[in-house]
Each structure stands twice: as structure tokens, then as C-alpha cells.
Amino acid sequence: MLERSMNISDFDPELFDAIAKETARQEDHIELIASENYCSPRVLEAQGSQLTNKYAEGYPGKRYYGGCEHVDVVEQLAIDRANELFGSDYANVQPHAGSQANAAVFLALLNAGDTVLGMSLAHGGHLTHGSHVNFSGKLYNAIQYGLDETTGEIDYAQVEALALEHKPKMIIGGFSAYSGIVDWAKLREIADKIGAYFFVDMAHVAGLIAAGIYPSPVPHAHVVTTTTHKTLAGPRGGLIISACGDEAIYKKLNSAVFPGGQGGPLCHVIAAKAVAFKEALQPEFKVYQTQVVKNAQAMVAVMQERGYKIVSDKTENHLFLLDLINKDITGKDADAALGNAHITVNKNSVPNDPRSPFVTSGLRIGSPAITRRGFKEAESKELAGWICDVLDNINDESVQAQVREKVKAICAKLPVYA
């Protein structure tokens, strides 16, 4: 007999302690990892529901199991809301993660060994855009483009030259560490010149796009994928959308997700996605996303005043890359020092980085999580100053201790969950 009174704390105190400590860490530390965010209690409620008990292989109205009439409603709500949010006419809400969504696109549109052209991981791309350590670089002939060394922006001339030379079957747009605005129309124009598919991974900026403050790739791409967390602030998961109008492509995508790459969908996560999409359709979501960009730009301004180099010299979205080569500080050391001050970032390679990916010469910093807990420009500028204080005195633990106390105070003032 399962009783509602059953709980983790009584049954598994060791696990409960780890969960409690992580909950406290999220409240007491400042989160600046660009891919992390806080989902709402409504999303948490949906994800913790009894929907997790239900198997539902297939799609709404076309299941391989009985008893799916209610999860059909849940999934259709998620599909309809995703389409409304992004202006698409096709949505698959079943991918367990962004990487699985990307894998489904490869499986649907390509054959093993086909050539793809994507952004280099070293210049701000993603593992699934052709990195040699990932399936996208192991199973496919991956060619990589990067940034213009002078401007720090995507080198579209290089993209076109590589496309004309290698004739990829698919060109990939999107990034995991790029602070500029991507010219989706230009990339589609290049793809059309060689008859290639144009696929966009908008995972990092999906929330900004949903709010209408970053250009949407949906009118330009054959297929678009995203995660549902990051700037969208939903549960961890993936999403595939399209407005290309090609039913043959839609059918291939559905088959690539199930049965091609996954079995049963995670119904509880799909419910949480539906909640998050509804939240993103509210007017206050645009206010939030606008503040996300303002906060990132405020931090950049302070760091530049303090003598720190920003890749591309600016940010036009939620993140930026701090280039520490001229400071002779490794990303690894900077990450550790800031972590000791209870400021969580991630080390990140910068263009033409002389150090290994395990050490790096940069930091990736993002503003979605701090904005979610109420930071505005004033707090963001103050925070940027604290970061510079720590980096200016990278080995001084007393400075880290001073900043840690300031972090403690502002986190108490602006809790994640009030």
C-alpha cells in the first residue's frame, strides 16, 4: 500500500540531506551559468505529478498503450502552446533534452557520413553542432565555421565559402556561447545557394525569442530545436518546431523522435513544458526577458570599465564571454575563486584559446537566473564589481570571504522562492 505520508526524509535521510543542501545552495549562491535558471513552483508541481507513472508510446490519438486519454490532452496542450509561442505549425514536445532533439533532426534529415556545417565549439557552438567528440562529429562529416577575429562576430563570408566548397547537406545555426545577434536570413540564403537544409538550435535564446526581443529563426529555418529550460525557464527537456510547411519533414521528425531515438515520452515533463509555455505567453514574461538583456549589458559595462575584455566587445542577449588571456588568469582558477565567493560561473574556451578545454582562458556568464530572483541593473552592476574584485585578487581568500558575505546578504534580500 502506498501512503501519501511516505517521504524521502524518513526513508532515505542521506539522499534527503543532499537534496536539502542543493536547495540551500541555490538560495544562498548567485547563479551565473548561462544555461541555468529557476523554474516556477507550477512547473515543479507538474513535474512531480503522477503523470510520471504513465507509459504513452506514440503520439496523441495514436498510442501503443491504452489509458492515454488524459495524457493525450496534456501533450496536445503542450504542442498547441509551443506553436502559439513561436509561430510554428509543427511541434514535437517529446525530446528528453536538447541534444536528443538535435539527434532526431540529424536522424530525420541526413544519412550517416553526410556533410554538415556548424559553428565550432571553440568559437561558441555546441557539442551537437559537429564536435569530434559528439555523435554529430563521429557519424557525420562535420565542417566548422567560427568568428571573425576582428569583430568577434560570426564570419558569414567564411560560412559561405565553406558551404560552397564542401556542399553540406545541412547548415546549423545557433550557439552555446555567443553574445551577438545571428543573421538567420543570411544563413538561410547560404543554405539555399547549395540546396542544403537550414537547421537552427535556438536553445540559449528561446526565451528571448518567445518574448520578441531577439530575432526568431522560425520563419527562416527548415527545423528549429530548443531546450525548455535555460531562458525559457521551464523543466529540463527538448522541443522541435517548424513552420516550413513540409509535411514530409514533419513525419520524418516524428519518426526520428519515436521510435527512432526514444521510447515512451516523459508525460510529467511534458506537462511541465505545457505549464512553462503558458507562463511564457504571459505579458510579464516579456518584462522578464527584457530585464535579462539589460542585466547582462550592465555587467559588461562594469567589467569593461574595470579593464576586462569581452568577446565581441558587447552582448545583445543573455550571456557574454569574459576573455582572461590578457590577465593571465585561467578559466579554471577564476571559476574556483568565484565559487569560493558563492558566485557560480563556468570556465569556457574563448576564440583562439591557447589552453585546453579543461583549463580554458575564459568564463561564460549569463543573467537569466539572477534576473529570475529579482536583480535589476543596479544589483547586476554591483555583482559585476564583486566579480572583478575577486579576479583582481585571484589568490586572496580574504577578498573572496568579503564578497561571500555580500552575496549572502543580497541572496537573503532577493530569494529564489519567496
Curated annotation (Swiss-Prot):
Sequence positions bearing N6-(pyridoxal phosphate)lysine: 230
Pathways per UniProt: One-carbon metabolism; tetrahydrofolate interconversion; Amino-acid biosynthesis; glycine biosynthesis; glycine from L-serine: step 1/1
Top-level class of the enzyme under EC nomenclature: transferase
Protein keywords: Amino-acid biosynthesis, Cytoplasm, One-carbon metabolism, Pyridoxal phosphate, Transferase
A GO biological-process term: tetrahydrofolate interconversion
One of the record's GO molecular function terms: pyridoxal phosphate binding
Cell compartment(s), UniProt: Cytoplasm
SUPFAM superfamilies: PLP-dependent transferases (SSF53383)
Catalytically driven reaction(s): (6R)-5,10-methylene-5,6,7,8-tetrahydrofolate + glycine + H2O = (6S)-5,6,7,8-tetrahydrofolate + L-serine
EC code(s) of this entry: 2.1.2.1
Site entry (Plays an important role in substrate specificity), positions: 229
GO cellular component, one term: cytosol
Presence of the UniProt keyword S-adenosyl-L-methionine in the record: no
Cofactor (UniProt): pyridoxal 5'-phosphate
Residue numbers binding (6S)-5,6,7,8-tetrahydrofolate: 121, 125-127, 356-358
Quaternary state and interactors: Homodimer.
Entry function: Catalyzes the reversible interconversion of serine and glycine with tetrahydrofolate (THF) serving as the one-carbon carrier. This reaction serves as the major source of one-carbon groups required for the biosynthesis of purines, thymidylate, methionine, and other important biomolecules. Also exhibits THF-independent aldolase activity toward beta-hydroxyamino acids, producing glycine and aldehydes, via a retro-aldol mechanism.
Family, similarity comment: Belongs to the SHMT family.
NCBIfam families: PRK00011.1 (NF000586)
Protein name: Serine hydroxymethyltransferase
